[in-house]
Amino acid sequence: MNTENIDENLKNDENSIPNINELEITNSNDRNTFEQKCLYPALKLIYSGIMGSSNQPIIVGSTALYLQGIYYDKFPNDIDVCILNKSDIFKYTIAFGRMCKKYGFNVDFITYDTQNTDETSYTKININDITILAAFKERCIDFLQSFRDFYIEKNNSKRAQKYAEKLIYLQEHYPELFNVSDE
């Protein structure tokens, strides 16, 4: 498999950094719609036992930043959030992790970055996006499509579309990545 092309499609740029203030929903009807279409499916994914190498439920990248940034009170304290990002691109990661810890969450950072050796909250694991995406398999597709469609509708959000289509691209072109044993 040619992973170079995959990596190119998975790259994020500065414009894709999530801005929590931009994403906040203030209209109660919009909030209810979001909870039905996006938040509850995400919680269902967590409770269904999608586990990471540290035996933690996983929410990936900007979805984790978004959901946790607005709805941290919806997550019970015994649920851990494992954020998988390129920390040199997502400048929110460290501050976001500290916020999670403040509200009682255990946070692992799995990252490409090996230069921030003074940041004690990092877990130094060499992992790539393919491994991350394969761990989600097709169970993540419906959630990402809902996430994308909702924000295209409400905010014309290219960020949401770009994020969701990373996974959709891989599912269409490399379906073998999603045939991962549950064992």
Language-model regions, residue ranges each:
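Active-site nucleotide-donor binding segment shared across nucleotidyl transfer reactions
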Residues: K44-I79, L84-I89
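Residues that form or immediately flank small-molecule/cofactor binding pockets and catalytic motifs
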Residues: S62-A64, Y112-T114, K137-R139
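Metal-dependent nucleotidyltransferase catalytic core
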Residues: N29-L43, C82-T120
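Helical scaffold of the NTase/Pol beta-like nucleotidyltransferase catalytic core
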Residues: N2-I59
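Catalytic cores of NTP-dependent nucleotidyl/adenyl transfer enzymes across multiple folds
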Residues: D7, D13, I17-N29, N116-E183
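Generic preference for hydrophobic
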Residues: I59, V81, F109, I132-A134
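N-terminal cationic-hydrophobic initiation segments that often serve targeting/anchoring roles
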Residues: Y47-M51, G97-C100, Q171
